[in-house]
């Protein structure tokens, strides 16, 4: 079976000098290798092709046959690694929490342990008849986040 760590090393070494970074390497049954990349500027098809050829030059198909797919994460794909979070600062996110609640807001800051979102809540001021929008900062611990996606 193809070694996932070997593929991660090959990809990480190849990408070490550029803006493109590794998001995920998955190996599915039948030796189907899926490599996902991302970049602040987006990933072009030429980068995917070049990386695919580099991986093929490093992993011998004669020893073990495999299917290789190299692509970029979609704009609405869930955020998986810290660099994706960092690239989304000042972007609108939809964050699904482990308790089932959903928060939507602008990402202000990100750290390994927590994020800070700017959310708009409808709040009824004391003595007022109607609720008014109020901007609030919400800190969410990373462990409480089930999934987060960019809102386009």
From Swiss-Prot:
Pfam families: RimP_N. The keyword DNA-binding does not apply. One of its GO terms (cellular component) is cytosol. HAMAP family: RimP. The lineage of its organism: Bacteria, Pseudomonadati, Bacteroidota, Bacteroidia, Bacteroidales. Keywords: Cytoplasm, Ribosome biogenesis. It comes from the Bacteria. Belongs to the RimP family. PANTHER family: RIBOSOME MATURATION FACTOR RIMP. Required for maturation of 30S ribosomal subunits. InterPro entries: Ribosome_maturation_RimP (IPR003728), RimP_N (IPR028989), RimP_N_sf (IPR035956). This is Ribosome maturation factor RimP. The keyword Cytoplasm applies.
């Amino acid at each position: 079976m193809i070694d996932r760590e070997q593929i991660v090393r090959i990809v990480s070494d190849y990408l070490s000098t550029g803006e493109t970074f590794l998001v995920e390497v998955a190996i599915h049954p039948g030796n189907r290798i899926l490599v996902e990349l991302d970049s602040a500027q987006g990933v072009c098809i030429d980068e995917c092709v070049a990386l695919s050829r580099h991986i093929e030059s490093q992993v011998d198909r004669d020893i073990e046959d495999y299917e290789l797919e190299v692509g970029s994460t979609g704009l609405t794909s869930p955020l998986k690694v810290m660099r994706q979070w960092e690239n989304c600062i000042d972007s609108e996110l939809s964050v699904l929490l482990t308790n089932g609640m959903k928060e939507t807001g602008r990402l202000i800051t990100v750290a390994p342990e927590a994020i800070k979102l700017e959310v708009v809540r409808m709040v009824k001021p004391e003595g007022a008849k109607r609720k008014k929008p109020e901007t609030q900062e919400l800190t969410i611990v990373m462990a409480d986040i089930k999934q987060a996606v960019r809102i386009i």
